[in-house]
Amino acid sequence: YGMSLVCFVVSLFLKRRKALLHFATVFLCMAVLWHLFGIAARMYIQSRPPVTNLYSSVVFAGVVASLFGGTLYILRRQLPVAAVACASGLLSLLVAMNLPYSGDTMGMMRAVLNSNFWLTMHVMTIMIGYGSVFFAGFLASYHLVARFFGQGEKGLKAGACGVYRILLVALFFCFLGTMLGGIWADMSWGRFWGWDPKENGALMTLLWCSCTLHARLLHVCSCQGFLVLASLGNIVAAWGWFGVNLMGIGLHSYGFVEGGWFWFFLFVGLQVLAAASAL
């Protein structure tokens, strides 16, 4: 991911970049395939779905964002999309490596998580949703920072259009994942919704995506304002995903880790700076 990211970023400033883009694309494809192989190996060893704890959720969301971005790049040949795809994959693996786990990341699953079909579908769909939200947020942040350094209005509008479409996908999977989570909760402890911190986090992310899309659809905000909302959506998603796990409470929080607040608030600060670059 790192090599591909460097190649894509350098190519942004070159006129003759065909060969460099070819190498960057090959590196990205190799990284995504190796990422997928790692997930498949964990599934084979554990005989479990790809998402069983906070570590595996980060790894899975990262490959979703990279695969999503890489596919969009191949179809549309937009360099910012490719660069964000590489950055998303690289960041996910770095975060996973530095999570406050001690020892094995493939430990025994808790009894309530060692469950059924509905749990598998819930975690898969909700993590695809979160991965899409973060990809849209990072792409929005890129265009806001690029605007600060002189990107034209045409590039801003193209970026807003791409982010809008990605958020549509994110909204669909966040909604589906939240509903499937309710079905699993009903089967596990007899209630569909109980305002558990994890449930509240998923609902916050879902509502933020919906509000952001409606603000753009109803022309409540400009392209730049829409990108700001999409960028801030990363903070909402990070809280719904990481924050409630780091709190260490809740019935079906799959993180079960302590610590990490420094990195969480560092991420929040960087996202606020990216959004503030629109001012």
Task: Give residue ranges: language-model regions.
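Membrane interface segments of multi-pass transport proteins and intramembrane proteases
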Residues: 115, 151-153
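Hydrophobic cores of alpha-helical transmembrane segments in multi-pass integral membrane proteins
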Residues: 1-13, 21-48, 52-107, 118-149, ...
